[in-house]
């Protein structure tokens, strides 16, 4: 969700937000948008839609090589680190109780628990089908740390992943790192990410630009 929101901000397109539950989304996950009556689901396809319809290019100024690098980084984040985050939130009982469990709080009491457990089971089945869910907790944490370390190395001392100005992949990275760094959920991968000051600064930089009120509250 954060990825799409930042991409809309980078594109300077006006938008509104509404609360939604993953189970009610067209593809069973958030985000999705409605644009002039057209429903578009999946953050990558949403970006494609926005760029084609409104004639924008979130990677404007990037060379062919840099665009390829951006795509490779995005795949590492969304096809690997994302699933490590899914594991820590859905597979670990303490974190599930703090977060995803509450998606179902507004359901009628007679179906709430059954729906909650069925949804959790489907997510864990998807995690196993992806492959990461077949590993032990310690192995998942180690693999998650590798993606965090790789992202930190790719960012280096730059303000953004591919230079002085943000591009599309920075929105993806921000969504992932902001999600991982939230202190609400306990995990070794989160603590490892906190030890990489450039990733924390990257998150804070985008927060200051697009969500200044959040930083003031945190202070």
Regions found by a protein language model. Give the residues of each.
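Charge-dense, extended regions
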Residues: 209, 213-219
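Acidic carboxylate-rich catalytic motifs and surrounding loops in phosphoryl-/glycosyl-chemistry enzymes
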Residues: 18-22, 166, 218-219
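GST-like fold's C-terminal all-alpha helical module
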Residues: 83-200, 204
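GST-like domain detector, emphasizing the conserved glutathione-binding G-site
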Residues: 1-113
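Non-transmembrane alpha-helical segments in soluble domains
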Residues: 47, 51, 71-74, 78, ...
């Amino acid at each position: 969700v954060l990825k799409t929101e930042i991409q809309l901000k980078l594109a300077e397109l006006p938008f509104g937000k509404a609360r939604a539950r993953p189970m009610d989304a067209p593809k069973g996950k958030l985000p999705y948008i409605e644009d002039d009556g057209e429903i578009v689901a999946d953050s990558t396809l949403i970006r494609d839609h926005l760029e084609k319809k409104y004639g924008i290019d979130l990677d404007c100024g990037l060379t062919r090589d840099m665009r390829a690098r951006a795509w490779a980084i995005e795949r590492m984040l969304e096809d690997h680190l994302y699933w490590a985050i899914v594991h820590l939130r859905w597979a670990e009982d303490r974190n599930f109780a703090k977060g995803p469990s509450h998606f179902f709080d507004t359901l009628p009491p007679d179906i709430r628990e059954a729906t909650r457990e069925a949804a959790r089971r489907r997510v864990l089945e998807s995690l196993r089908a992806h492959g990461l869910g077949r590993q032990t907790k310690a192995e998942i944490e180690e693999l998650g740390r590798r993606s965090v370390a790789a992202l930190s190395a790719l960012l280096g001392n730059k303000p953004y992943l591919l230079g002085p100005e943000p591009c599309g992949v920075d929105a993806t990275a921000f969504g992932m790192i902001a999600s991982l760094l939230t202190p609400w959920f306990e995990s070794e991968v989160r603590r490892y990410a906190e030890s990489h000051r450039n990733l924390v600064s990257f998150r804070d930089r985008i927060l200051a630009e697009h969500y200044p009120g959040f930083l003031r509250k945190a202070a």
